[in-house]
Regions:
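Post-DEXD/H (motif II) to motif III coupling segment of the RecA-like Helicase ATP-binding lobe
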Residues: 79-134
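Conserved RecA-like helicase motor core of SF1/SF2 enzymes
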Residues: 168-181, 185-234
Length: 234
């Protein structure tokens, strides 16, 4: 996502589609810090900030304006083409959304074959992650170290874990799509500023949010995927 922001701001105009409203807000804030609020727009299903002379549009993928003819266009997490609920939107963007001078699709290697078949002239770039992961074994939630994110797979589960952490650790932030934009943003800021050392969230935070997390824990090994309960898979 950092690379996409750099490329967009290198052009006179640009549009970027992101999978989460919270991520769109994060990218919007970064672009405003670099270019100022008078030229950056934010469009999601909940927020709409469009200055009269907007040059850069930061949006959720569903809310992307595809008719403005921007010099640059990017779609993040393009592997969501395979998602049962949102896949049709990402597939439409893959097939039809283009920048006048540059188009960038970011996502997992699982899309390499599809993109090569549909866009044979596309250039593939790999960006290595700088962080490393190591398995720390199972732990009780009350034993989690500071700067931990605990991922739950239902609203009830998230609230129950948050209450347990508040009782045992003194405080935590809660991030879910069901919260209002203002509340979500405030909760992320609470954690990022170090006011609390624990974050409890749904698994949506895995789609590109840049958080200062040293440890990640899952509340279980099964989740409801919209149709059935299933095991988590890598």
């Amino acid at each position: 996502t950092h690379y996409a922001i750099e490329r967009m701001l290198a052009h006179r105009t640009g549009v970027i589609g992101l999978p989460l409203r919270l991520l769109a807000r994060e990218v919007y804030d970064k672009c405003v810090a670099l270019r100022g609020p008078s030229v950056v727009a934010l469009v999601t299903g909940e927020e709409r900030i469009v200055p009269p002379r907007a040059q850069y549009w930061v949006c959720t993928t569903e809310a992307m304006p595809t008719e403005i003819g921007a010099d640059f266009l990017a779609v993040d997490e393009i592997q969501l083409c395979a998602d049962p609920e949102r896949g049709h939107v990402f597939t439409d963007r893959l097939l039809n959304a283009r920048g006048l001078h540059e188009t960038l699709f970011l996502g997992a290697d699982t899309m390499r074959g599809v993109i090569a078949a549909e866009l044979p002239k596309a250039q593939v770039m790999r960006r290595e992650r700088f962080s490393t992961l190591s398995y720390a074994g199972s732990k009780k939630i009350s034993r989690m170290p500071p700067r931990s994110a605990i991922v739950g797979f239902s609203v009830e589960n998230v609230y129950a874990m948050a209450e347990l952490i508040r009782r045992t650790k003194g405080g935590c932030a809660v991030v879910m799509g069901a919260l209002s934009p203002r509340t979500r943003n405030a909760q992320v800021e609470l954690y990022q500023n170090g006011d609390v050392d624990y974050l409890v969230a749904t698994d949506a935070i895995g789609m590109g949010l840049n958080l200062d997390v040293a440890h990640v824990a899952f509340s279980g090994l099964r989740k409801f995927d919209g149709r059935k309960m299933r095991q988590l898979a890598p």
